[in-house]
From Swiss-Prot:
Location of the Ubiquitin-like domain: 337-408
Positions in coiled-coil regions: 197-220
Keyword Membrane: no
Record key words, sorted: Coiled coil, Cytoplasm, Isopeptide bond, Methylation, Nucleus, Phosphoprotein, Ubl conjugation
Protein species of origin: Macaca fascicularis (Crab-eating macaque)
Record-listed Phosphoserine modification sites: 41, 43, 73, 77, 79, 81, 116, 187, 190, 193, 209, 303, 358, 379
Record PROSITE patterns: UBIQUITIN_2
Low complexity bias (residue ranges): 24-40
Domain of life of the organism encoding this protein: Eukaryota
GO biological process terms, semicolon-separated: positive regulation of transcription by RNA polymerase II; protein sumoylation
Descriptive protein name: NFATC2-interacting protein
Modified residues (Phosphothreonine): 305, 307
Length: 408
């Protein structure tokens, strides 16, 4: 398309030496590409790009390429014929015409409709949707205004006064107002202002400071005075012991319920008192030996050493009392008779235990030995009847406490 450009000018005269050979440049840098300018545009941004491209292309100067080889020297008075002889042989080269630089102002660019009527009818216009406002935040309006003042617009961004954007903005504002009105209607009470919150906060701080001050005053009153000659310790090291008045301990009585046969006995008892007191009380109440008293809680036999606290007894709990039958040892003991033997003198009295099946001769011999009257002839009488010593207490119907008289 383009050929290398010829010489740009002659060298200065005055020296007889020949011209210096210049370095040959590559044809790619020495050629100019044809730049087509689209005069039909619907935005000013494309015009600016074309202008900048043209300016960048003009800054690159194309250096002429000269054929290698020495060039004949020329005198100051050389003529046209001499200059023609000095040129190298070969076909003459046509100089490339330099194109005129075309600079278009944004205001001078003609506005030509790009689309025909059919194309406009088939275009899908931007819908009036509020979701598009997210793609066009409010901060971009300032950028659009700045671009409008400088005459540049972002590619693909709508114009500042586009009707669809203003319509979306107005719709968004209306919906926000509606939601705010609904929120105010739904809320029974408006939220407290930050001023009221700060007042509440200051009141709470004042109350806390008053409480702390009172506690410090109380601590200063209760803390003992430090002894003289000793350094006062820090507040953190102080230990205050407050001893209250010693009150006499009042034992708490626990009403224990005891069921025996058809009777229900209520016995006040301390929680730490053993159940032996219950056994003694029931033995006295029933007129039997304490060894024959058995306490049961449900089906569990209770030990006399246990306490209501260890057994975890409550007010509604009832203890059963059972009277056991007499044991064989008790039967034998009951068969023993306590008989009194009385002599002439008051001091000659002796109490002797004798079995019902034992003869009375044993009692007589025991009395003679105890009183030192062995060898003497003594007579023993029971209810006016003289005893020979071969009788049995059971045959005579004797009981414990009966009296036998001695004469001699």
């Amino acid at each position: 398309m383009a050929e290398p450009v010829g010489k740009r000018g002659r060298l200065s005269r005055g020296s007889g030496a020949g011209r210096r050979p210049r370095a040959q440049r590559s044809p790619s840098r020495g050629t100019l590409d044809v730049v087509s300018v689209d005069l039909v545009s619907d935005s000013d941004e494309e015009i600016v790009e074309v202008t900048s491209a043209r300016c960048a292309a003009d800054e690159v100067e194309v250096a002429p390429s000269e054929p290698p080889g020495p060039v004949a020297s020329r005198d100051d008075s050389d003529s046209d014929s001499e200059g023609a002889d000095a040129r190298p042989a070969g076909p003459p080269r046509e100089p490339v015409r330099r194109r005129r630089r075309l600079v278009l102002d944004p205001g001078e660019a003609p506005l030509v409709p790009v689309y025909s009527g059919k194309v406009k009818s088939s275009l899908c216009l931007i819908p009036d949707d509020l979701s598009l406002l997210k793609l066009y935040p409010p901060g971009d309006e300032e950028e659009v205004e700045l671009a409008d003042s400088s005459g540049l617009y972002h590619e693909g961004s709508p114009s500042p006064g586009s009707p669809w954007k203003t319509k979306l903005r107005t719709k968004d504002k209306e919906e926000k107002k509606k939601t705010e009105i609904l929120d105010l209607d739904n809320s029974p009470l408006s939220p407290p202002s930050p001023r009221t919150k700060s007042r509440k906060h200051t009141r709470a701080l004042k109350k806390l400071s008053e409480v702390n001050k009172r506690l410090q005053d109380l601590r200063s009153c209760l803390s003992p005075e430090p002894p003289q000659g000793q350094e006062q310790q820090g507040q953190e090291d102080e230990v205050v012991l407050v001893e209250g008045p010693t009150l006499p301990e009042t034992p708490r009585l626990f009403p224990l319920k005891i069921r025996c046969r058809a009777d229900l006995v209520r016995l006040p008892l301390r929680m730490s008192e053993p159940l032996q007191s219950v056994v003694d009380h029931m033995a006295t109440h029933l007129g039997v030996s304490p060894s024959r008293i058995l306490l049961l809680f449900g089906e569990t036999e209770l030990s006399p050493t246990a306490t209501p606290r260890t057994l975890k007894l409550g007010v509604a709990d009832i203890i059963d009392c059972v009277v056991l039958a007499s044991s064989p040892e008790a039967t034998e003991t009951s068969r023993q008779l306590q008989l009194r033997v009385q002599g002439k003198e008051k001091h000659q009295t002796l109490e002797v235990s004798l079995s019902r099946d034992s003869p009375l001769k044993t009692l007589m011999s025991h009395y003679e030995e105890a009183m030192g009257l062995s060898g003497r002839k003594l007579s023993f009488f029971f209810d006016g009847t003289k005893l020979s010593g071969r009788e049995l207490p059971a045959d005579l119907g004797m009981e414990s406490g009966d009296l036998i008289e001695v004469w001699g």
